[in-house]
From Swiss-Prot:
Site entry (Transition state stabilizer), positions: R16, K24
Superkingdom of this protein's organism: Bacteria
Originating species: Neorickettsia sennetsu (strain ATCC VR-367 / Miyayama) (Ehrlichia sennetsu)
CDD domains tied to this protein: CDP-ME_synthetase
Reactions performed catalytically: 2-C-methyl-D-erythritol 4-phosphate + CTP + H(+) = 4-CDP-2-C-methyl-D-erythritol + diphosphate
One GO term (biological process): isopentenyl diphosphate biosynthetic process, methylerythritol 4-phosphate pathway
Protein name: 2-C-methyl-D-erythritol 4-phosphate cytidylyltransferase
Pathway listed: Isoprenoid biosynthesis; isopentenyl diphosphate biosynthesis via DXP pathway; isopentenyl diphosphate from 1-deoxy-D-xylulose 5-phosphate: step 2/6
Nucleotidyltransferase keyword on record: yes
Alphabetical keyword list: Isoprene biosynthesis, Nucleotidyltransferase, Transferase
Protein purpose: Catalyzes the formation of 4-diphosphocytidyl-2-C-methyl-D-erythritol from CTP and 2-C-methyl-D-erythritol 4-phosphate (MEP).
Gene label: ispD
Keyword Oxidoreductase: no
Length: 232
């Protein structure tokens, strides 16, 4: 078995967090940056040997202290692109020299990914899955608004909320990204969708409702609550 690498997409420059001038991945919860929690969660799995961060060099003053805190781990960097897809491709190109067998692609602002989810993704990959995406059921009622203003019901039993980390056979996802950039015809917001569009077989596994992506002000408060509970 080859190396399993983590790839954390941390190049986002915007934030929906009220009154924040920092990208959300650098905001602190209980004295630690969200990005550091995210990286440490990956390294907590014994099979993940290295983590690559895709960052915006303009945020150097924010990510260098995090790197110092992670000095005991194998962490590398590359420059983020204009879109998430650009950034993931940047990270995959940087990881190519390490020749990993698999890669877990993670959002920077998911600090509470559980060992159970990470282990399930890796287990599925090692059992032969080409791509693995954690998902959770939709709890709310969903409607679809048509252009004419007509609203139709959507069967939520058929829907799932997609989470990360999403795991892939490295060679297959790298080939899919190269094919996409040879003829970019669509914008993708997650790696599983791009993988499916390029012929990779993607399996869904159960995610975890606590694996939230920090996006809104309430998420920060909830993150603080979760950490308070975990340290009791």
């Amino acid at each position: 078995m080859g190396k399993i690498a983590g790839l954390v997409v941390a190049g986002g420059g915007g934030s929906r967090i009220t009154n924040s001038v920092l990208p959300k991945q650098y905001l602190q919860v209980r004295g630690k940056a969200i990005l550091q929690y995210t990286v440490e969660a990956l390294f907590a799995h014994p099979k993940i040997e290295c983590v690559h961060l895709v960052v915006n060099s303009k945020c150097e003053v924010h990510y260098l202290p995090i790197l110092r805190n992670l000095s005991g781990y194998v962490v590398s960097l590359s420059e983020a692109g204009n879109t998430r897809t650009d950034s993931v491709f940047s990270g995959l190109k940087a990881l190519e020299c390490l020749n990993p067998s698999h890669v877990l692609i993670q959002d920077a602002a998911r600090p509470f990914t559980t060992p159970k989810v990470i282990n399930a993704v890796i287990k599925s990959l090692l059992e032969g899955c080409e791509g693995v995406v954690p998902v959770v059921p939709v709890q709310d009622t969903i409607i679809k608004r048509e252009p004419e203003g007509i609203v139709t019901d959507v069967n939520r039993d058929e829907l799932r909320i997609v989470q990360t980390p999403q795991g892939f056979d490295f060679c297959k996802i790298f080939a899919a990204y190269k094919a996409h950039f040879m003829c970019p015809s669509k914008r993708y917001t997650d790696d599983g969708s791009l993988a499916l569009a390029h012929g990779i077989k993607v399996e869904c596994i159960p995610g975890d409702s606590s694996n939230l992506k920090i996006t809104h002000p309430f998420d920060l408060k909830f993150a603080d609550f979760l950490l308070a509970q975990s340290h009791r």
